[in-house]
Design a protein with these regions (language model features):
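Metal-dependent phosphoester-hydrolase catalytic domains
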Residues: 9-77, 201, 253-265, 271-357
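Active-site-proximal beta-strand elements of phosphoester/diester hydrolases
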Residues: 88-101, 189, 218-228
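Active-site beta-strand/loop signature of hydrolases that rely on acidic residues for catalysis
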Residues: 94-96, 126-146, 209, 221, ...
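Metal-dependent phosphoester/phosphodiester hydrolase catalytic core
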Residues: 214-222, 226-244
């Protein structure tokens, strides 16, 4: 009898130890995958939000005050009431190349070097040169970096009272948008599961906002930054970009179905050229009603390149803007590329702009 009690106590201790080992292993997996199911089960994370069907005009996440400033988010958008094309509204996109500042909360284990003051001034000079009303940013560090840039732009006479920065756990390079006009909807998602993947997610999420002008015009702006080409396994990186592009195409298809007729612009650093698979997936869409048109802006010399790739010693068109047919019919021209001398100091990418109507 005593012997059996001993073995029962031993087995209970052994089982408890095994349970603790498995629990710690599960927490470590979730720490690096971004999936917090186990944490929620333990009561250490907020309850999971139910996956909601997109409804035009309904934001599907709450925006912390330190990372977003919007107008009151609207529950519904009357697409039929959108005014006809009016005065042009300039949109500019720029990969600002590691715009990190001191004091920013670090989200990865990598060593980050703050961007120099001269380089940050150069970024502000480029944006001020184009005088946009809406700015899409790639590789901005976070809320502090965005505030730093907004202050430099304000010193140059450009005020952007509305903004959104999309932060992805484990990734220091964020997406952001600045706007002169109110952001009235937000469908941005930081944790987007990849197509045909159970746990793996897009590296930087999908930025997705709707901006309303004073005359009632609406523009839906979507931004993305696909997997870098700087990787040990180039084939794996290319495959990941394709998966991310397909996932983004699914997002765009949903927009096309739920808000048909709404002017849509998609900007991104695709880390692939126009003829490569990832940008073509985004442009062609998953159905005819979700197909986009690529703009072909040029600089003052008639050149289209947006990045000089030092490793391959080649000029690339990795930064691209797509628009849906509704918006393209309202526009005139292809836009341009800011090629002032400050461009070389600001980033390894050049800024693109286009005029929306």
């Amino acid at each position: 009898m005593h012997g059996s009690n001993f073995w029962m106590r031993y087995l209970r201790k052994d089982s408890l130890l095994l349970f603790l080992v498995l629990l710690v292993a599960g927490l470590l997996v979730e720490r690096f995958s971004g999936d917090d199911t186990l944490l929620r089960w333990l009561g250490a994370a907020p309850p999971a939000q139910q996956q909601q069907e997109y409804v035009p005009g309904v934001a599907n996440l709450e925006l912390p005050a330190e990372v977003a400033h919007t107008a009151p988010l609207q529950k519904q958008v009357d697409i039929a009431a959108i005014p006809r094309p009016g005065k042009p509204v300039r949109f500019l996109m720029h990969n600002v190349q590691n715009y990190f500042v001191e004091g920013e909360v670090q989200r990865s284990p990598y060593v980050l070097k703050p961007k120099t003051r001269n380089s940050r001034d150069a970024v502000a000079d480029i944006i001020a040169e184009a005088k946009p009303q809406i700015v899409g940013l790639i590789e901005i560090g976070g809320p502090l970096a965005l505030q730093d840039l907004r202050q430099r732009l304000a010193a140059r006479g450009l005020e952007f009272p509305y903004y959104r920065v999309l932060i992805r756990p484990g990734e220091d390079r964020a997406l952001a948008v600045l706007s002169v006009h109110p952001i009235v909807q937000d469908h941005s998602q930081s944790k987007v599961k990849l197509h045909q993947q159970k746990r793996r997610k897009m590296l930087r999420g999908i930025l997705d906002v709707t901006i309303r002008l004073d005359d009632g015009r609406l523009f839906r702006i979507v931004g993305a930054h696909l997997k870098s080409r700087v990787a040990e396994d180039a084939a794996a990186a290319s495959a990941l970009r394709k998966q991310e592009a397909y996932t983004l195409a699914q997002h765009i298809q949903h927009i096309a179905r739920m808000q048909k007729g709404l002017p849509l612009l998609v900007f991104g650093d695709w880390n692939d050229g126009p003829a490569d698979a990832a940008p073509r997936i985004v442009q062609q869409g998953l159905s005819q009603d979700a197909a986009l048109r690529r703009l072909s802006p040029e600089d003052s010399r008639g050149e289209e390149w947006t990045l000089y790739y030092k490793r391959g010693k080649e000029y690339c068109v990795y930064d691209q803007i797509f628009v849906n047919p509704v918006l393209r019919e309202r526009m005139r021209g292809q836009g341009g590329i800011v090629d002032i001398p400050a461009a070389a100091k600001a980033s390894d990418h050049r800024a693109l702009w286009c005029d929306l109507r």
